[in-house]
Amino acid sequence: MKRLILIALTAAMTLQGQAQGTREDYLNAFGTRETCSGKMLNGDVWVRPVHLAGADTMYYSTYNGTGTVWYSVNIHNGEKQQVENPDRNRQERRRGGGSQYHWMTVRDEKDGRAQNPADGSQCIIHRNNNLYLVTDNNDQAATAITQDGKDTCYYSSWGAWSADGRYYATVMIKPAPKHYVTYTMSSPRNQVQPIYSQLEYAKPGDSLNYRIPVVVDVQEQRTIFPKSTQLFASQYNVTAPQWDEGCQTLTFEFNERGHKTFRVLEMDLEGNVRTLIEEHNDKYVAYSRNWRQDLNSRFILWKSDRSGRAHLYLYDRKKDRLTPVTSGDYWVRDIIHCETDAKGKGYVIFSANGKGCKNMGKPASSMDQSITEEDPYNIHYYRITLDGKHLVALTPEKANHRATFSREHEAFIDTYSSITQAPVTVLRSAKDGKLIATLEKADISRLEESGWKPAEVFVAPGRDGKTDMWGIIQRPRNFDPSKKYPIIEYIYSGPGSQYVPKDFTPWLYNLTDLAELGFIVVQLDAMTTSYRTLDFEQVCYKNLKDAGFPDRIAWIKAAAARYPYMDISRVGIYGCSAGGQEALGALLFHPEFYKAGYAACGCHDNRMDKIWWNEQWMGYPVDSSYIECSNVENAHRLQGKLMLAVGEMDDNVDPSSSYQVVNALIKANKDFEFILLPGAHHTMGEYYGEHKRYDFFVKSLLGTDPPAWDELKKK
């Protein structure tokens, strides 16, 4: 009998020792941010692009353990000295007299007031759908300079004068009906009754404004229209025309509806329109990545991913020729500075990722074995001449770089780090990358003393068995390799960027806290995300439900094969917005792998979400692919455990998208949980939803009851 009691007590103690999702774990989870806060010294460097002491000085601040300190740096020799905050006397000024507009609102462009650069006493205003010339600010005596504007086709007053003050370039707008989303604020703060409101919100398939470039000859009071609209007929948007040097031509950009064609167009003062640059792709042109700088009247610097990666090109108007400036196995990100002469000779400073990363790396064999190949997403800075020669790497260290350049672009302050490498801040020459001075080296000893451990970078092939996926693995601080840990993936796979953190970040909001409950939390960039190759990204086309899941599953399986404590039979997933759509999609389309999902504010049917994001990746017109990718249409497939959350005032994704999923799940007789957050906007769930998410995964994947909420009080 005594032996049986001893065995029972031993078993109970063993189970208690292996418990996860305990009150202590919850307190650790809720306290990780505070635990990590303020424990990295001289690492969070903030460079201010202010030059109060002239072009030879830069300023930066950092945290030294007792507070924020500011330094001035001589960009030529690297000498620094502590100073007061150079912005201490600066006061933020708010614009007065203007109206506030929501970012989804399409302005009617009737409130412009364009000053004549050649005659400051003149300006153009909009009145009765036409343009009027105002002299000496006497609006009452304004003279009509157009007569044919009407409600169905009016002149925009958001235009530009020619430098000589004779011409005014603008657009005529044929307005389309507006689409509105209706909101109910159920529990306003200062009243009992709900508040109802509407928000302008165009959705896929909606009609759009039609825009026609036009030039008004103010001197002769005549209008010059394009002789043909063929080159910009089926438009998603036409930008306002801009004057070229000499005031004889204008340029504007045309973005085709469906985004398969993008053109930079030129119009002369006779109404002739010609194509300068054209981008075309049978799937889509990611127009938000296009970038253009008119260097002078002859040359244009242009960024395009036509080669399969984003690169820079120099367009010569005289020769009508587009010549590569950059090329190769990297992806140009941002253009920092460009200088040129009339003949197109000069240089450009830019950032890019992926250069030299032909071999994307292999999985590490253990936690302490580093990956020798550089992360292809790391950002570096380069300088190259506009003839495509003399490429100079300005940031040689294998790390992710964040640079701020001096006023004249002679030098730059660069902070580089990685998930596992603490930040180092240096001053370098912008001409050749030569190290001028090391300014700061982060001290993370306090952080390490707290028990903190960095996430691990893990690399494994995706669906094709050869293209490597890069991600991170976060373990709890009390990690015990003898235990079994469920896996939770944090997902956001929306095309247009990459999302796995690359900088040294002690507290990873989407991973660190949740891991403390007794989970292994992972995040990776799979196919459908950006900055590798266009083919890598375009898996998403008319196929957002893919979300890189074949790659994600392969990567997680590879990690679990490497680390047996990762329990591949208990995999959860969570995300917000597009990540909310993807989290639910994981349960609907891959139920054999994902067993539990938390989906917040998801765009669960792309027909319900904002036009510009969804038509970019799903195409136009709206077709059956929208239905095939819809979580609403596929709700009957649900097998795993699901928690949905939405803010009733979500002004990013129409909350009805979540309500429609709820309705479809009810009709399909599916068991699930739903959290409606009164007054909340676009959110992962705020504090309440975060706590519910913790409990949901503890119950669903750990199979244990979470501690009562009133027990979770700080010690």
What feature does the model see in each segment?
Residues 8-18:
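Hydrophobic h-region of N-terminal signal peptides that target proteins for export
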Residues 247, 395, 400-715:
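Serine-hydrolase catalytic core recognition
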Residues 188-196, 201-324, 333:
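Beta-propeller domains
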